[in-house]
């Protein structure tokens, strides 16, 4: 999950949507005509800094999208979620042009993004895609499959990768197949992609997973089980020897339905629970305009940086140096 749309199911979005991410945060505001995405990954920030002397700067996720460039393709309630699918016009002057976004829950959590003509997204899904070179050969689990953004990137960039994805809501998988090309991806990768509907925390595979990617949110917050050390011990036991877990742990930009569940507090509780299991072998990558906007966590011994970079596509190498030991 990496965005939040702050509007109730009854709210009509007439003029604007604003977002910040980890979750990006979208809010409807009257008498405005822009959609803004104030969050950007640091790789993108660094590129923009290098262009700061230019008088004609390219559009960034900070810039708005005219509302006429956004179309609602689907909107309905399932047993588990309030589901919306948005499409951003290819004519929009914005980095998200040509994308489709999956929003879930009353706060409007955006769980997936997909572009028609490119693989990478300039979101944390790209960071997830840096894990294959630092894990043993073997299957990767995606816990919180959404519409398949993570799986799509992994399958496109790593021809030998096998992905097993778990999603609780069958309606989300139906939407993924209809609006996010999941049916086509499944047909083309019958021996490489396996999608299951059910509780992701029960995920298991004989022989274990080489890597586990965790992206589990409900009602706008990391699920409570992730604040329990027992959950991480169970996931650790699901790994092959040398395997790793990478987690979207959210941050201050997460807006939960329950206002008591502050995103930054929940993130720290999750990291502390992980620390109880993984000890010093826990690293954090901070994203966003502010240091605590959103974060990812990585377990295991820290890889040798240059070796890791050299095994990645050039467009992903910039993320490697952003990891820091967790010191909470």
PLM regions and their residue ranges:
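The AdoMet/dcAdoMet-binding core of the Class I SAM-like
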Residues: 2-5, 39-46, 53-56, 113-278, ...
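SAM/dcSAM-binding transferase cores
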Residues: 2-97, 101, 109-115, 130-133, ...
């Amino acid at each position: 999950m990496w965005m939040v749309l702050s509007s109730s199911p009854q709210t009509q979005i007439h003029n604007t949507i604003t977002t910040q991410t980890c979750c990006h945060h979208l809010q409807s505001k009257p008498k405005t005509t822009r959609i803004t995405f104030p969050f950007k990954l640091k790789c993108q920030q660094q590129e923009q800094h290098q262009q700061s002397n230019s008088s004609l700067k390219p559009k960034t996720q900070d810039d708005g999208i005219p509302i006429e460039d956004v179309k609602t393709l689907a909107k309905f309630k399932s047993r588990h979620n309030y589901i919306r699918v948005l499409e951003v016009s290819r004519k929009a002057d914005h980095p998200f042009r040509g994308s489709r976004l999956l929003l879930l829950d009353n706060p409007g959590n955006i769980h997936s993004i997909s572009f028609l003509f490119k693989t990478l997204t300039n979101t944390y899904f790209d960071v997830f895609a840096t894990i294959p070179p630092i894990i043993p050969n073997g299957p990767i689990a995606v816990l919180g499959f959404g519409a398949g953004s993570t799986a799509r990137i992994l399958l496109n960039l790593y021809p030998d990768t096998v992905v097993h994805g778990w999603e609780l809501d069958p309606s989300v998988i139906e939407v993924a197949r209809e609006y996010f090309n999941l049916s086509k991806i499944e047909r083309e990768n019958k021996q490489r992609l396996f999608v299951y509907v059910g509780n992701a925390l029960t995920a298991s595979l004989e022989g274990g997973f080489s890597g586990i990617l965790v992206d589990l949110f409900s009602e706008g917050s990391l699920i409570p089980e992730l604040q329990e050390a027992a959950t991480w011990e169970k996931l650790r036991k699901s790994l092959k020897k040398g395997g790793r877990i990478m987690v979207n742990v959210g941050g201050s930009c997460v807006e939960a339905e329950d206002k008591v569940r502050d995103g930054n507090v929940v993130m720290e509780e999750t990291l502390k629970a992980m620390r109880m299991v993984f000890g010093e072998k826990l690293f954090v990558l901070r994203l966003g305009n502010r240091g605590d906007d959103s974060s990812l966590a990585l377990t295991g011994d820290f890889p040798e940086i240059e070796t890791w970079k050299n095994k990645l596509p050039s467009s992903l190498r910039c993320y490697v140096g952003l990891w820091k030991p967790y010191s909470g």
